[in-house]
């Protein structure tokens, strides 16, 4: 995934990055890996980017039920994914859990965007990455009310 900076937050990039819709053409029918990972990168760098936060918040709120339903399904059972969903359910995602999620996605200094079965214990569903970023932002006093 290409690293973006706060100055890259044009309306076009906001719309692009906020697309969390399922993409059946991708392997395993995953949500868009690159978008979710870029969202996480940008939240790390630009937690107060208000227009970006507003757009992502809007998309997230529209998708909340759908995401929670997916989280209850047997196909959505990675432990780190559940951390994010539990945070959505009103429980707190600790900084240690956030750090664990971030570190598990670091591969050779970059960000993994592939579903690697050999790393299935540390793989985090791309939508969960976006949710973790949202939860972290919420804890930092931004994004969600």
Each language-model region and where it sits:
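Buried hydrophobic core positions in alpha-solenoid tandem helical repeats
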Residues: 17-21, 59-68, 98-102
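Conserved blade-ending motifs and adjacent loop-strand segments that build the rim/top face
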Residues: 102-121
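Short helix-loop boundary/capping segments
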Residues: 51-61
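Kelch-like beta-propeller repeat domains
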Residues: 23-24, 107
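An alpha-helical repeat/solenoid feature that recognizes helix-turn-helix modules
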Residues: 1-14, 25-49, 70-96, 116-142
């Amino acid at each position: 995934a290409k690293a973006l900076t706060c100055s890259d937050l044009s309306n076009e990039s906001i719309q692009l990055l906020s697309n969390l819709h399922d993409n059946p053409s991708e392997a395993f029918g995953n949500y868009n890996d690159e978008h979710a990972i870029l969202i996480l990168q940008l939240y790390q760098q630009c937690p107060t980017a208000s227009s970006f936060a507003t757009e992502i918040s809007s998309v997230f709120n529209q998708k909340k039920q759908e995401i929670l339903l997916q989280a209850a399904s047997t196909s959505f059972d990675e432990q780190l994914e559940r951390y994010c969903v539990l945070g959505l359910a009103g429980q707190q995602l600790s900084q240690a859990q956030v750090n664990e999620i971030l570190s598990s996605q670091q591969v050779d200094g970059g960000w993994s965007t592939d579903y690697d079965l050999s790393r299935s214990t540390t793989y985090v569903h791309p939508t969960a990455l976006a949710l973790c970023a949202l939860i972290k932002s919420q804890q930092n006093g931004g994004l969600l009310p």
